[in-house]
């Protein structure tokens, strides 16, 4: 997770949790003048559009006071969706048995991209099976991770 996302997570998590939601993670996508701040939230009963609106108002109020982003951006608040992003070790633990796609910050064995089944996750390491081969990936080295939806 990049420094800005870490700072924003620390800043916004208490406000999101105060509304009864889990802050799954944050993505800040720089795209010239049109940057996007994506805030992913979840709840055991699911997420509604009204939930997203409530969290958006809360997050906007916090950001207006703290003003941590110097460029213009659009705020998007949503549920993680079927292709749920994986930000924390906890998310990989919850994804054991599922297929995930990950991109590493630093290559391992000349590879940065891995798509496979999560076998286990403990002590900051994710065990992923890719085409019958097992890889041990450090959560700290994962730049981006998502669950790959399967339709059986």
UniProtKB/Swiss-Prot annotation:
It is found in: Cytoplasm. One of its GO terms (biological process) is translation. SUPFAM superfamilies: YhbC-like, C-terminal domain (SSF74942), YhbC-like, N-terminal domain (SSF75420). Keywords: Cytoplasm, Ribosome biogenesis. One of its GO terms (cellular component) is cytosol. InterPro entries: Ribosome_maturation_RimP, RimP_C, RimP_C_sf, RimP_N, RimP_N_sf. CDD domains: YlxS_C. It comes from the Bacteria. Pfam families: DUF150_C (PF17384), RimP_N (PF02576). Its main location: cytoplasm. Belongs to the RimP family. PANTHER family: RIBOSOME MATURATION FACTOR RIMP. Required for maturation of 30S ribosomal subunits. This is Ribosome maturation factor RimP. It comes from Alteromonas mediterranea (strain DSM 17117 / CIP 110805 / LMG 28347 / Deep ecotype). The gene is rimP.
